[in-house]
Amino acid sequence: MRFLRWIRQIWRKVPNWVLFWKHLAKPGLSDQREKHLLKGPEKTSKDFDTVKLANAQKEDMVSDLDVCPGVLRSVKERSPLHDRESRSSRDSRSLMTVVNSVSTFMFSVLQSGWRLCRWKSSMSTGKVSSHTRTGSALGTPEAEMLREVYLVLWVIRKQLRELARRQERRRRRRMRSHASHTSRHSESVQGLKHDARSPL
């Protein structure tokens, strides 16, 4: 039947979907590779005096902090850690939407398959009582296949939920480490300002 062929096709595609979402859930390895590749030509192009550049940048940073204290906030907002956090939160949101879509798909498959099983059992048995019709509908091979499909979808939903929870835990860990890093950075900036204002 067309319904059974459709269920078999979906069943074959299910592992590919799980692998695809697992690949999306992993942190961006391609960004790290691109950064690693970009570091090479940058190193070869830097032939000027690095000591003078570092001193000039330090003086500019201290003067900018004295003039405009909002620069540190804008730099923090554009930091790569902030970008990674936003990317991981987007990934966790997409995983949760996939979990919801799989749940609704499970419900629709169960409902339509149950209707099909009841219709087939009523067509084969004819006029019988509702209790006997329910028992015969549960014993059909279509009902058995529907149970197997439902179990596979339930396992997929469970795996996707675990992936979403891992992503959320990873995102919270990164936020904590980012907060500690920014606090340490602000302390070092305060020390630089104090050194710049001291007469010694």
Curated annotation (Swiss-Prot):
GO terms for cellular component: acrosomal vesicle. Residues 167-183 have a biased composition (Basic residues). One of its GO terms (biological process) is spermatid development. InterPro entries: SPACDR. Residues 184-200 have a biased composition (Basic and acidic residues). Its main location: cytoplasm. It is found in: Cytoplasmic vesicle, Secretory vesicle, Acrosome. Signal peptide: none annotated. The modification Phosphoserine is found at residue 63. Residues 167-200 are annotated as: Disordered. Keywords: Cytoplasmic vesicle, Differentiation, Phosphoprotein, Spermatogenesis. It comes from the Eukaryota. PANTHER family: CHROMOSOME 7 OPEN READING FRAME 61, SPERM ACROSOME DEVELOPMENTAL REGULATOR. May play an important role in acrosome formation and nucleus shaping during spermiogenesis. This is Sperm acrosome developmental regulator. It comes from Rattus norvegicus (Rat).
